[in-house]
Protein backbone atom coordinates (compact mmCIF):
# COMPACT_ATOMS: atom_id res chain seq x y z
CA UNK A 1 0.00 0.00 0.00
CA UNK A 2 1.33 3.42 -0.83
CA UNK A 3 0.00 6.67 0.47
CA UNK A 4 0.39 10.14 -0.92
CA UNK A 5 1.22 11.93 2.33
CA UNK A 6 3.18 15.16 2.15
CA UNK A 7 5.28 13.87 5.04
CA UNK A 8 8.32 11.66 4.56
CA UNK A 9 11.90 11.84 3.41
CA UNK A 10 11.59 15.37 2.07
CA UNK A 11 10.62 16.57 5.54
CA UNK A 12 13.60 14.81 7.09
CA UNK A 13 15.89 16.41 4.50
CA UNK A 14 14.39 19.78 5.35
CA UNK A 15 16.17 19.50 8.69
CA UNK A 16 19.07 17.08 8.16
CA UNK A 17 21.25 15.87 5.32
CA UNK A 18 21.92 12.18 4.67
CA UNK A 19 25.26 12.23 6.52
CA UNK A 20 23.67 13.77 9.61
CA UNK A 21 20.84 11.21 9.60
CA UNK A 22 23.34 8.36 9.19
CA UNK A 23 25.40 9.68 12.09
CA UNK A 24 22.35 10.04 14.35
CA UNK A 25 20.74 6.69 13.50
CA UNK A 26 22.87 4.57 15.89
CA UNK A 27 21.82 6.91 18.72
CA UNK A 28 18.08 6.43 18.11
CA UNK A 29 16.16 4.30 20.58
CA UNK A 30 13.22 2.90 18.59
CA UNK A 31 11.90 1.00 21.63
CA UNK A 32 11.53 4.17 23.70
CA UNK A 33 8.96 6.75 22.48
CA UNK A 34 10.06 10.38 22.61
CA UNK A 35 6.64 11.62 23.69
CA UNK A 36 6.73 14.19 20.88
CA UNK A 37 3.49 14.53 18.94
CA UNK A 38 4.71 15.75 15.57
CA UNK A 39 2.86 15.88 12.28
CA UNK A 40 5.92 16.45 10.09
CA UNK A 41 5.22 18.66 7.07
CA UNK A 42 7.45 21.26 5.43
CA UNK A 43 4.50 23.54 4.70
CA UNK A 44 0.76 23.55 5.37
CA UNK A 45 -1.27 21.05 3.40
CA UNK A 46 -1.85 17.31 3.57
CA UNK A 47 -3.27 14.77 1.10
CA UNK A 48 -3.25 11.46 2.99
CA UNK A 49 -4.45 10.14 5.39
CA UNK A 50 -6.50 13.32 5.55
CA UNK A 51 -7.18 15.70 2.70
CA UNK A 52 -6.77 19.23 4.00
CA UNK A 53 -4.85 21.79 1.92
CA UNK A 54 -4.41 24.01 4.97
CA UNK A 55 -3.44 21.34 7.53
CA UNK A 56 -0.60 22.85 9.56
CA UNK A 57 2.69 21.14 10.37
CA UNK A 58 3.15 20.26 14.03
CA UNK A 59 6.87 20.41 14.87
CA UNK A 60 7.01 21.81 18.38
CA UNK A 61 8.34 21.59 20.95
CA UNK A 62 11.77 21.25 19.35
CA UNK A 63 14.17 19.55 21.75
CA UNK A 64 17.72 20.85 21.89
CA UNK A 65 18.99 17.35 21.11
CA UNK A 66 18.90 16.72 17.35
CA UNK A 67 18.72 12.94 17.86
CA UNK A 68 15.49 13.27 19.86
CA UNK A 69 14.09 15.66 17.26
CA UNK A 70 15.04 13.25 14.44
CA UNK A 71 13.37 10.34 16.25
CA UNK A 72 10.29 12.48 16.90
CA UNK A 73 10.04 13.22 13.17
CA UNK A 74 10.33 9.50 12.38
CA UNK A 75 7.64 8.70 14.95
CA UNK A 76 5.36 11.31 13.40
CA UNK A 77 5.82 9.83 9.93
CA UNK A 78 5.13 6.34 11.31
CA UNK A 79 1.95 7.57 13.02
CA UNK A 80 0.76 8.95 9.68
CA UNK A 81 1.35 5.52 8.15
CA UNK A 82 -0.45 3.91 11.10
CA UNK A 83 -3.44 6.22 10.58
CA UNK A 84 -3.56 5.28 6.90
CA UNK A 85 -3.83 1.59 7.79
CA UNK A 86 -6.52 2.41 10.39
CA UNK A 87 -8.58 4.27 7.79
CA UNK A 88 -8.25 1.40 5.32
CA UNK A 89 -9.44 -1.03 8.02
CA UNK A 90 -12.43 1.22 8.75
CA UNK A 91 -13.32 0.92 5.06
CA UNK A 92 -13.21 -2.88 5.26
CA UNK A 93 -9.65 -3.65 4.20
CA UNK A 94 -7.83 -6.28 6.23
CA UNK A 95 -5.26 -4.99 8.69
CA UNK A 96 -1.71 -5.80 7.63
CA UNK A 97 -0.04 -8.81 9.21
CA UNK A 98 3.37 -7.61 8.03
CA UNK A 99 4.77 -4.69 6.07
CA UNK A 100 7.47 -4.75 3.41
CA UNK A 101 9.16 -1.57 2.40
CA UNK A 102 11.72 -0.44 -0.12
CA UNK A 103 13.75 2.68 -0.66
CA UNK A 104 16.30 4.53 1.42
CA UNK A 105 14.32 4.46 4.64
CA UNK A 106 13.98 0.69 4.46
CA UNK A 107 17.77 0.46 4.88
CA UNK A 108 17.60 2.18 8.28
CA UNK A 109 17.24 -0.52 10.94
CA UNK A 110 16.22 1.93 13.70
CA UNK A 111 13.46 3.38 11.49
CA UNK A 112 12.30 -0.14 10.63
CA UNK A 113 12.14 -1.10 14.33
CA UNK A 114 10.30 2.11 15.19
CA UNK A 115 7.70 1.42 12.49
CA UNK A 116 7.29 -2.18 13.67
CA UNK A 117 6.63 -0.92 17.20
CA UNK A 118 4.01 1.62 16.12
CA UNK A 119 2.35 -0.54 13.45
CA UNK A 120 2.47 -3.65 15.67
CA UNK A 121 3.47 -5.89 12.77
CA UNK A 122 6.77 -7.36 11.60
CA UNK A 123 8.68 -5.35 9.03
CA UNK A 124 9.99 -7.71 6.36
CA UNK A 125 12.79 -7.12 3.89
CA UNK A 126 11.78 -7.99 0.34
CA UNK A 127 14.15 -10.04 -1.79
CA UNK A 128 14.30 -7.22 -4.33
CA UNK A 129 14.42 -3.75 -2.80
CA UNK A 130 13.98 -1.64 -5.92
CA UNK A 131 10.47 -0.18 -6.08
CA UNK A 132 10.52 -0.59 -9.86
CA UNK A 133 10.76 -4.37 -9.39
CA UNK A 134 7.38 -4.44 -7.64
CA UNK A 135 5.84 -2.25 -10.33
CA UNK A 136 7.19 -4.61 -12.98
CA UNK A 137 5.68 -7.63 -11.18
CA UNK A 138 2.30 -5.93 -11.00
CA UNK A 139 2.49 -5.09 -14.70
CA UNK A 140 3.42 -8.68 -15.53
CA UNK A 141 0.50 -10.06 -13.52
CA UNK A 142 -1.82 -7.61 -15.21
CA UNK A 143 -0.93 -9.02 -18.63
CA UNK A 144 -1.55 -12.65 -17.71
Please give the residue ranges for each predicted region.
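Active-site core segments that coordinate phosphate-bearing ligands/cofactors
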Residues: 1-99, 107-131, 136-144
